[in-house]
């Protein structure tokens, strides 16, 4: 299955027709959904590839977001090159989620930066996109070197490079620097205060780059951390572990506060990603069944919700030619359908029922409360501030008197509404298929 997906994606790279690529990705998404529903147990193939439910879920999310990013970029320039970049990112992400070796995972983990950087630099809006791309590369490459060092150290200490290895076979001295080994994942998530590259990359990236970055690329950090922590023997009561969780939750709350004072729509959605991914980090680091389940659910829910919000920002940018909140007021007057979709996605972003975010946050809140009452208090504050900045986003764009004359609803806007609806429907109905 994995080889077939890879070959099909390579074939789509060769094709220059955007419509053919969309149809091909749609077929691959349906096949991946079938694989995700069947592969409930873990199976390792040839020592290189593995298949399980999480892998199938992440691959399905990758292809689904790639399709919607295509639809949101119907009027992009240099379509052949754009097609090459997006399919290349999708192929590398599929391979990242499929491999069973930490060394191969590191290779694809870093390889995704190349087409993503070209997408930002080649189709970005402002001259500052070069600086944003430099920030992204420096941050992620620097952190990933520690992960490579950690995997090499564990391999030399007796553990194989397979993700199904047993960490208890490794010397405890090799495990002592586990917090340094996971630095690359913390940057990719990103965890506060390693998040500075993310708002810059989002602001300068085209809509497809923002959708893929927020929807899938950030999930590489959570997925890699999940696989790595399963083989690590980390004491949950250690002082450094508690300190890491405390900084993570405090940073998530501070990122939520930063959302409320943003004036740029893309920055607001980018900082909301930092706040939500801190919950993923808490669930994964708890190393419990409920925590890991909650983290996976939040990753899928956030992937759909954040991608949809970036698509919404692009839709109103095409009409008002500005990302500033003050320039996009009064949306309910000129495009009530888009405002309705903004409300639906904002409500899902604040974990309103029946969105996936609600079920994931309930599980993570339970794990956090079992660990410490102080953690539960901070999680409550994070939930409150999440509702605040989600309502702030909706209220700022829907009410008030607009300062610019915006274009009326046209065929392009109808396509944007379809893309937004395609994000919202699985986000609020996938709970019926949860195991």
From Swiss-Prot:
Q: Where, subcellularly, is it found?
A: Mitochondrion membrane
EC assignment:
7.1.1.2
Question: Which key words are in the record?
Answer: Electron transport, Membrane, Mitochondrion, NAD, Respiratory chain, Translocase, Transmembrane, Transmembrane helix, Transport, Ubiquinone
| A Gene Ontology term for the protein's cellular component | mitochondrial membrane
**Biological process per Gene Ontology, one example term:** electron transport coupled proton transport
One Pfam family linked to the record: Proton_antipo_M
Q: Which GO terms describe its molecular function?
A: NADH dehydrogenase (ubiquinone) activity; ubiquinone binding
Membrane topology type: Multi-pass membrane protein
Reactions that this protein is recorded to catalyse: a ubiquinone + NADH + 5 H(+)(in) = a ubiquinol + NAD(+) + 4 H(+)(out)
Spell out where the chain crosses the membrane.
Answer: 27-47, 53-73, 80-100, 102-122, 132-152, 177-197, 206-226, 239-259, 267-285, 295-317, 324-344, 372-394, 414-434
Which positions carry the signal peptide feature in this UniProt record?
none
Q: Which family does it belong to?
A: Belongs to the complex I subunit 4 family.
What is the documented function of this protein?
Answer: Core subunit of the mitochondrial membrane respiratory chain NADH dehydrogenase (Complex I) that is believed to belong to the minimal assembly required for catalysis. Complex I functions in the transfer of electrons from NADH to the respiratory chain. The immediate electron acceptor for the enzyme is believed to be ubiquinone.
Name the UniProt record assigns to this protein: NADH-ubiquinone oxidoreductase chain 4
Give the organism the record lists.
Answer: Mytilus edulis
The primary gene name is ND4
